[in-house]
């Protein structure tokens, strides 16, 4: 299989935009999403933008935008964050709905995008894809240390390493000539550069390298353009129909 030039792949990897944070480890499966209902939030010890977005049922990219935060979204105890897009009430509900429709429009599947994608791991999606400037160009899935990370589709491993700051142990797999998937923040990496992998093959274990959050950052890219993984993945726990 003809591969893109290594330099181009490395440049593409640098452009991956993940929501890196200083999260303390939290079991999001036990945290009630949307349990906090106010227009502002005062940061407490151990809080992170991921956690605040989760309990306020907001998007990390929206909170970062209205509070003018840049990755890796470092927070200070006592810092007051706005949860609404104006000085009045309303939180991010209308903003999120508008953003969601914009995301759907901008991430229309390109030709050939419908292929047999599988979930790379199981767990709560704690940050979704966003088309906003500086937004998450994939999804972040919370889980437990050491849980399996799987190849989303068959392909060839084109990058295994940790040279890209903020992504920790990163694996990239090329699928055909146009698609690449990325798997970041792994604990152990179980594949080598140039290795062929099958769909559903275990390629790594979940960790928090490059971040303080136990999670997998996952991307699907078409000719270097980020797609919304949730538009292509089946429901969690459901095998792909292919």
Which ranges hold each PLM region?
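Bacterial N-terminal signal peptides that target proteins for export
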Residues: 1-9
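C-terminal motif of bacterial Sec signal peptides marking the signal peptidase cleavage site
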Residues: 16-19
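Extracellular LysM carbohydrate-binding repeats and other cell-envelope/extracellular binding modules
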Residues: 21-45, 51-92
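Surface-exposed strand-loop junctions at beta-sheet edges and helix termini
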Residues: 43, 69, 143, 152, ...
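Short hydrophobic beta/alpha edge segments that flank linear recognition/processing sites
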Residues: 49, 81, 141, 170-171, ...
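Short histidine-centered loop motifs in beta-beta connectors
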Residues: 68, 160, 176-200
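Surface-exposed, glycine-biased beta-strand/turn segments
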Residues: 76-80, 85-168, 227-230
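Conserved, short, structured surface segments that act as functional micro-motifs
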Residues: 195-242
């Amino acid at each position: 299989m003809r591969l893109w030039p290594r330099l181009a792949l490395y440049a593409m990897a640098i452009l991956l935009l993940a929501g890196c944070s200083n999260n303390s480890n939290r079991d999001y499966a036990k945290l009630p999403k949307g349990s906090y209902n106010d227009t502002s939030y005062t940061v407490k010890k151990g809080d992170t933008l991921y956690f605040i977005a989760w309990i306020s049922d907001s998007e990390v990219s929206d909170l970062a935008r209205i509070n003018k935060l840049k990755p890796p979204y470092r927070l200070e105890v006592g810092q007051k964050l706005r949860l609404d897009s104006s000085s009045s009430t309303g939180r991010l509900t209308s903003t999120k709905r508008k953003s969601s429709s914009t995301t759907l429009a901008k991430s229309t599947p390109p030709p050939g995008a419908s292929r047999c994608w599988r979930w790379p791991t199981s767990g709560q999606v704690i940050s979704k894809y966003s088309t906003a400037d500086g937004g998450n160009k994939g999804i972040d899935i919370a889980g437990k240390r050491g849980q399996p990370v799987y190849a989303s589709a068959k392909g060839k491993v084109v990058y295994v390493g940790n040279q890209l700051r903020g992504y920790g142990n990163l694996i990239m797999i090329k699928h055909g000539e146009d698609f690449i998937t990325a798997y970041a923040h792994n604990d152990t990496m179980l594949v080598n550069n140039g290795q062929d992998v099958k769909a559903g093959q275990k390629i790594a274990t979940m960790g928090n390298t490059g971040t303080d959050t136990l999670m997998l950052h996952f991307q699907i890219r078409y000719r270097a353009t980020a797609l919304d993984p949730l538009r292509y993945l089946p429901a969690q726990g459901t095998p792909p129909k292919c």
